[in-house]
Swiss-Prot record:
This is Phosphoribosyl-AMP cyclohydrolase. It catalyses: 1-(5-phospho-beta-D-ribosyl)-5'-AMP + H2O = 1-(5-phospho-beta-D-ribosyl)-5-[(5-phospho-beta-D-ribosylamino)methylideneamino]imidazole-4-carboxamide. GO terms for cellular component: cytoplasm. Pathway: Amino-acid biosynthesis; L-histidine biosynthesis; L-histidine from 5-phospho-alpha-D-ribose 1-diphosphate: step 3/9. The keyword rRNA-binding does not apply. The gene is hisI. It comes from Erythrobacter litoralis (strain HTCC2594). Belongs to the PRA-CH family. Its cofactor is Mg(2+); Zn(2+). InterPro entries: PRA-CH, PRib_AMP_CycHydrolase_dom, PRib_AMP_CycHydrolase_sf.
Length: 125
């Protein structure tokens, strides 16, 4: 992607994602209705493109070094309602309608534990 000015990046209308040195940007995934944070993942240009084209969240697996469609195996897809872009265009929030649990453990959200006095406590309700 071509470089744009800081002013255009921060206040303009040109979408020019600022990927890190590994070609990734952070994606925070929130439930469209409750705004609960469901997960955090990474997107490369291909994942961002696939998400925009299909309306289903796609991410880049750093461990497997491959593109993956969330819910491709489990069926627990994330239908993207809106993509919010931060001021630096190096992170996005995906507002989604989940088709099931967001976490691979089966939990509704990947954030189901709280750090309390040095130990993790389950906070699922």
């Amino acid at each position: 992607m071509s470089e744009i000015s800081a002013e255009e990046r921060e206040s303009g209308t040109v979408f020019a994602p600022k990927f890190d040195s590994d070609g990734l940007l952070t994606a925070v995934v929130q439930h469209v209705d409750t705004r609960e944070v469901l997960m955090v993942a990474f997107m490369n240009a291909d994942a961002l493109d696939a998400t925009r084209k299909t309306g289903i969240a796609h991410f880049f697996s750093r461990s497997r070094q491959t593109l993956w469609k969330k819910g491709g195996t489990s069926g627990n897809t994330l239908a993207v309602s809106q993509v919010l872009v931060d001021c630096d265009q190096d992170a996005v929030i995906l507002l989604v309608e989940p088709a099931g649990p967001a976490c691979h453990t089966g939990a509704r959200t990947c954030f189901y534990r709280e750090l309390d006095c040095g130990a993790l406590q389950d906070v699922r309700t």
